[in-house]
Amino acid sequence: MNLRDKLDVYLRLARMDRPIGTLLLLWPCLMALLLAAGGMPDLKVLTIFIFGVVVMRACGCIINDYADRDLDAHVDRTKSRPLASGEVTGREALILFAVMGLFAFGLVLMLNPLVVKLSVVGIILTIIYPFTKRFTNMPQMFLGVVWSWSIPMAYAAQTGEVPAEAWWLFAANWCWTVAYDTMYAMVDREDDLKVGIKSTAILFGKYDRQIIGLFQLAALACFITAGWAADRGLVYGLGIITFVGFSMYQQKLIHERERAPCFKAFLNNNWAGLSLFIALGVDYLI
């Protein structure tokens, strides 16, 4: 394998060819920076967090695939991943994870000590998450914490503290993550049952759609409260209404629990997050 082919494999291992995860991480992080800064985040902080989201999402994908390398080969959707297919060795994956993790930590060192401390917790959570699928039926709930951790970090970077209002956005994103990652887990439910991977899609069973709906409602309530705490106005409210519309569309897609529509519902959450972020940004502008 030549250098160009090897680089392509590493990029696929880091999921650089599939940006959906990065985008789902990015929108709430940017919202946190906007709210923490009153609409005008520091350019240095903004740049560091954008790069940090990209790199840490890649780290999460690498360590996830390393943990699942023996299981992914038995799942249709994941059997072609570089580790599962043998294109990359476990040692190579760990080295790449370490290099990218150190790069991300280097970015954080340019910020204040509180952010550095929170980042250490974040990397530990990132490493633990893939293994939660072995011993709990609720890995999506743990993932919700991991994927929301940039929110208190963003507040800490911008203000030097993590105020109470930050946790409303954290709670909103946690509920939203559980909802959309359960949709994602519905795609693999049959394969996961065969190989012993646990998920909320399996745990919720025939009540999956209803429970996803409850998490969507809880996310909505917390997003509203976060906006209220920051004294947001009409445009943010329109963003909330748009978010509701996307959530209803996702419920329609997962109604029959078929793989392709469930995956489409998962992907649709990118537009839900983007619309809410844009609404928040415009609300500050006017």
UniProtKB/Swiss-Prot annotation:
It is found in: Cell inner membrane. It catalyses: all-trans-octaprenyl diphosphate + 4-hydroxybenzoate = 4-hydroxy-3-(all-trans-octaprenyl)benzoate + diphosphate. GO terms for molecular function: 4-hydroxybenzoate polyprenyltransferase activity. Catalyzes the prenylation of para-hydroxybenzoate (PHB) with an all-trans polyprenyl group. Mediates the second step in the final reaction sequence of ubiquinone-8 (UQ-8) biosynthesis, which is the condensation of the polyisoprenoid side chain with PHB, generating the first membrane-bound Q intermediate 3-octaprenyl-4-hydroxybenzoate. One of its GO terms (cellular component) is plasma membrane. NCBIfam families: ubiA_proteo. It is an enzyme of class 2 (transferase). This is 4-hydroxybenzoate octaprenyltransferase. It holds the Pfam family UbiA. It is a multi-pass membrane protein. The chain crosses the membrane at residues 20-40, 43-63, 95-115, 142-162, 167-187, 210-230, 234-254. GO terms for biological process: ubiquinone biosynthetic process. Keywords: Cell inner membrane, Cell membrane, Magnesium, Membrane, Transferase, Transmembrane, Transmembrane helix, Ubiquinone biosynthesis. It comes from Shewanella sediminis (strain HAW-EB3). Pathway: Cofactor biosynthesis; ubiquinone biosynthesis. The gene is ubiA. Its EC number is 2.5.1.39. Belongs to the UbiA prenyltransferase family. Its cofactor is Mg(2+).
